Amino acid sequence: MSVKKKDLITLQDPEAKYPLPLIEKEQINHNTRRFRFGLPSPDHVLGLPVGNYVHLLAQINNELVIRAYTPVSSDDDQGFVDLIIKIYFKNVHPKYPEGGKMTQYLENMKIGDTILFRGPTGRLFYNEPGTLLIKTDKTSEPEKKLVHHLGMIAGGTGITPMLQLIRHITKDTSDGTRMSLLFANQTEEDILLRKELEEVATTHQNQFSLWYTLDRPPSGWEYSSGFITADMIKEHLPPPGEATLILVCGPPPLIQEAAHPSLEQLGYTKDMIFTY
């Protein structure tokens, strides 16, 4: 059985590149899409350890462009891999008039077009309930960290690596690891995977809690507003401790100007913080 299973893993070699076809595309909101890529057969799984991600590679205007993404599908899904990606269009952001190279390339892909996948990649592995393996860099040996409570700070599509862990941990009701998510977005419309996150928060209250903050909240908004602050972290995430790990994923300003300074201010040490 194990031999057959290995044969049906798509990402057999982390250095190889696997061309996968686009088989479905769904518009989630004005600038976010779900892209579904087909695996070599309906029985194949991607073969991605929980905590890891993939790279997509494409030749765009004679330049090799490589970007990292965490799928929202898992190895419970056969025959396909799903990515949720925000498209950075031209002339929207004054700092980036050209927009995103890879995201606009994906947006222009037609059904049946292929793109190269490479992986698994990553420094974090969810080994077994309450145990993470973490590499300090790509080449180092993974170190074991026992975790009772995972805090999560996510901005925009930075939710995808968090969702991977949330799904995996809540699937096992005997896993006592707690997770608390602080999820930052610009507007209410930008909150990705909201329905699923709120469902999990309701059905797995002993494992998962959820809090939002919005840059531009609507009137009557019940959650926080503005950039992530130390007070928000203090109120909604686990305090510093040996069995605490805070995971951070999102755009650079969220990480460098909000999450990291606030965490340091509250006394979280480097070994309590993991940034994707």
UniProtKB/Swiss-Prot annotation:
Phosphotyrosine modification, residue list: 18
One BP annotation, GO: sterol biosynthetic process
CDD domains: cyt_b5_reduct_like
Domain FAD-binding FR-type residue range list: 15-127
Cofactor field: FAD
One Gene Ontology term, aspect cellular component: membrane
EC number: 1.6.2.2
Protein name: NADH-cytochrome b5 reductase 2
Organism phylogeny: Eukaryota, Metazoa, Chordata, Craniata, Vertebrata
Gene name for this UniProt entry: Cyb5r2
